[in-house]
């Protein structure tokens, strides 16, 4: 901590030459400290100590920001130099500097605690458009440069880590703001954004109705919901887990939206639409949600592309300077939904029967003690990943025009 104070005292403003990199360099030497859902609950329990949360976050948030800033710096130069990526980078550096100022403040100073909440709100608002702005930077880069397969793979690797980092920092900031802010705007039954008794089926039904409303507006019809729940831990009891309802709703809404669109378009000439079937199962270790549609499915070669940040079936949106930047069209729905699932050690997978339909499966941890943040860390392994060079494929690639062996034998 003394080293951090020395760096602070030696730093002036953001405009000082070479000062910002020293801040980033200092905090990037630390690894992020992942928290479990149980620890996040303890931070917000009745005996929650604002000073403890303050002391943790003023160190942890700069560490997480600095780690991902180091990864931004080793991206292709043409990408880093785009106006969009430069803007995102400036937001992260400014936020890091804002937070580091509190290293000189005492946790016993009530004004410092109050100012810290205000700063977290300011940082959260500043980062509001990070996702579409970074997406725009990728588009600018791809429009200007030819992107080889290895670079494309590295972009996927980076964006997974960048957006997971963003999910984690927003989670920590939201928890502190909701619990310790003077204006109590959260759900009284929640601890911050966490519901200790999350009714999974209720979230499923709400996400379905939200998706259905959009489907009705666009297609003037929508499929029904057929829901089954199986509680393998406590038979005949409702299914509840400790979770973040907004994260679960985000995943479900995206999957229902895709399932409804596929169903309506595939069955447009049918007298009625096949219902979307959902089964929710609580086991000893996992909570599993399977969403099945009869929307015609997708070919196997397309499945991996659906989780690519550079693939979308919607037209590419145009960015403007408003705060309401679009997300549809960037192709980010499924990959970011998968990140939400993976954030607390879960997963999201698609299994498709081309010509029939698709199963989407969400896996979540059933126990809060096992729901631990999955966080990227900038280290030698991460750096090495970006240094991979393009090598020849060690599997035969089928030719689009196979040789005519009969003709060759005749010759």
UniProtKB/Swiss-Prot annotation:
Induction: Up-regulated by prolonged fasting, in glucose-deprived cells and in response to a high-fat diet. Down-regulated by insulin. Up-regulated by PPARD.
Catalysis performed (reactions): L-seryl-[pyruvate dehydrogenase E1 alpha subunit] + ATP = O-phospho-L-seryl-[pyruvate dehydrogenase E1 alpha subunit] + ADP + H(+)
GO biological process, one term: regulation of ketone metabolic process
GO molecular function: ATP binding; protein kinase activity; pyruvate dehydrogenase (acetyl-transferring) kinase activity
Outcome, altering residue 161 to A: Loss of activity
EC annotation from Swiss-Prot or TrEMBL: 2.7.11.2
CDD domains, alphabetized: HATPase_PDK-like
Effect of residue 394 to A: Loss of activity
Record site feature (Interaction with the other subunit in the homodimer), residues: 157, 161, 395
Principal location listed in the UniProt entry: mitochondrion
Residues given in the record as ATP binding sites: 254-261, 293, 312-313, 329-334
Tissues of expression: Ubiquitous; highest levels of expression in heart and skeletal muscle.
SUPFAM superfamilies per record: alpha-ketoacid dehydrogenase kinase, N-terminal domain, ATPase domain of HSP90 chaperone/DNA topoisomerase II/histidine kinase
Segments forming a coiled coil: none
Top EC class, one word: transferase
Location of the Histidine kinase domain: 138-368
GO cellular component annotations of the record: mitochondrial matrix; mitochondrion
Subcellular location: Mitochondrion matrix
Subunit structure: Homodimer. Interacts with the pyruvate dehydrogenase complex subunit DLAT, and is part of the multimeric pyruvate dehydrogenase complex that contains multiple copies of pyruvate dehydrogenase (E1), dihydrolipoamide acetyltransferase (DLAT, E2) and lipoamide dehydrogenase (DLD, E3).
Entry's family note: Belongs to the PDK/BCKDK protein kinase family.
Biological function: Kinase that plays a key role in regulation of glucose and fatty acid metabolism and homeostasis via phosphorylation of the pyruvate dehydrogenase subunits PDHA1 and PDHA2. This inhibits pyruvate dehydrogenase activity, and thereby regulates metabolite flux through the tricarboxylic acid cycle, down-regulates aerobic respiration and inhibits the formation of acetyl-coenzyme A from pyruvate. Inhibition of pyruvate dehydrogenase decreases glucose utilization and increases fat metabolism in response to prolonged fasting and starvation.
Name this protein carries in UniProt: [Pyruvate dehydrogenase (acetyl-transferring)] kinase isozyme 4, mitochondrial
Natural source organism: Homo sapiens
